[in-house]
């Protein structure tokens, strides 16, 4: 271990703003508390989402074999980024988007130019709802989507669910002692001091995905 560092390989949750309790019941107090619990992928609730061929951006870069056919689920920057990466490396990529445009946070004119160029590299399927993911009895899966009442099927080696991430603040029971906003993000001020009822908690700070909507993953 590191000098002056005690390591507890357990889950823990807050019992007050400066004290956490581990799974084994031990309470740990700190005058200074740094919350850096990260985030987790949010998966659509459809049949087959738990199949081993379905990955998130936590696991997609650890593939042992390169997929020849990839379905990417998602509308945002992460979905577009991985669609570009895998298509540039030679995979046939289908990006399945529930809404009528991708990159909704980006200026529409920029998105239109991006889609025009990207469409030459991979397939962007707008206004498609994910119905289910089925195993095919081999290593592939069939992704079933719906568009205007019509069912479409795509056979793929791998599915990437890039459908958003959520802060892990709920696993810490943080909302009892700190401000928690949409998708579980802990409230902070410009100095990354955690807030409670809008005011900084003395000695409390948050780092990384647990407080920021701009996810590092």
Label for each model-derived stretch:
Residues 61-62, 67-71, 77-150, 214-217:
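Rossmann-like dinucleotide-binding cores of NAD(P)H-dependent redox enzymes
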Residues 51-66, 153, 158-217:
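FAD-site-proximal beta/loop scaffold in flavoenzymes
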Residues 16-44, 57, 62:
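Glycine-rich active-site/cofactor-binding loop and its immediate structural neighborhood
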Residues 35, 73-74:
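Conserved N-terminal Rossmann-fold NAD(P)-binding element of oxidoreductases
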Residues 38-39, 147, 160, 164-165:
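Short glycine-/small-residue-rich Rossmann-like dinucleotide-binding loops
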Residues 1-32, 124, 132-141:
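Feature captures the FAD/FMN-dependent oxidoreductase FAD-binding
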Residues 23-32, 149-158, 200:
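Core beta-strand elements of the Rossmann-like FAD/NAD(P) dinucleotide-binding domain
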């Amino acid at each position: 271990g590191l000098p002056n560092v005690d390591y507890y390989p357990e889950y823990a949750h807050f019992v007050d703003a400066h004290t956490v309790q581990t799974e084994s019941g031990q309470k740990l107090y700190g005058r200074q508390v740094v919350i850096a619990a990260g985030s987790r992928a949010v998966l659509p609730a459809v049949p087959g989402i738990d199949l081993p061929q379905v990955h998130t951006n936590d696991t997609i870069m650890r593939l042992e074999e390169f997929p020849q056919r990839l379905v990417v689920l998602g509308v945002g920057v992460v979905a577009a980024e991985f669609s570009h990466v895998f298509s540039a490396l030679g995979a046939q990529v289908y990006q399945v988007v529930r809404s009528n445009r991708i990159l909704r946070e980006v200026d529409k004119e920029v998105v239109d130019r991006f889609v025009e160029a990207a469409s030459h590299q991979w397939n962007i399927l707008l206004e498609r709802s994910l119905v289910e993911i089925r195993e095919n009895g081999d290593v592939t899966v069939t992704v079933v989507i719906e568009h205007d009442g019509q069912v479409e099927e795509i056979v793929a080696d791998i599915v990437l669910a890039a459908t958003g991430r959520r802060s892990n603040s709920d696993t810490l029971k943080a909302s009892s002692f700190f401000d928690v906003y949409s998708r579980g993000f802990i409230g902070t001020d410009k100095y990354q001091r955690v807030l409670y009822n809008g005011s900084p908690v003395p000695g409390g700070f948050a780092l990384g995905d647990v407080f920021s909507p701009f996810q590092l993953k």
